Amino acid sequence: MTFCIVKIGGSLIEVSRDVVRGLVSLSQEGDTFLVVPGGGPMADLVREIQQRYHISEDTAHWMAILAMEEYAHFLADGTGAELIDEISRPVSGVRVLLPYRPLMKDDRELLHTWDYTSDSVAALVAARLSADLVKATDVDGVILEGEVKREIPAEELIGKGTCIDQGALRILRRSGINCLVLDGRDPERFIASLKAGKGGTLIRGRGVGRSG
């Protein structure tokens, strides 16, 4: 049995519940998953409100965390996944994290800036649970100079604009957790890639990378 954290980005909202359904099906083989939701269009609205009304970074941060909770409810609805409001390994099946409550207790590793978004929350959760992290997004992987990288250290991506936020890269580097970035636009292909551990880009925190 394997366990991993799956971050599902808001960019996948059109197919995101199919991704969750695929995880639920995969969990019937004995695997367990903790889904960390993105912020989706709700977090985009928080950015707009901050720019328009000049709210503080702290307020925008917590509003964005609450936006993740809205997306969590969306992801769990009708998919067979269950909501959970604590950072813990599910005993079975698929759980979707409601992050506000556990982060209010302790979010010391998250700076309250837009460099630390839901990617950073997912990386923090993976670090706390010593678990692998998979980021489902709307690109084939980490793209540099027009090329999808098969594998790259987190250190090399710091300061570069890619599909994963800067805060997450710092957490990966500090914790040594790896993150597999996979294209989630085709849920069936995503699940197949996840099951095989192939495709996309492996961002290495520290230590060993892919075999073969």
Each model region followed by its residue ranges:
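C-terminal catalytic "cap/lid" subdomain
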Residues: 1-212
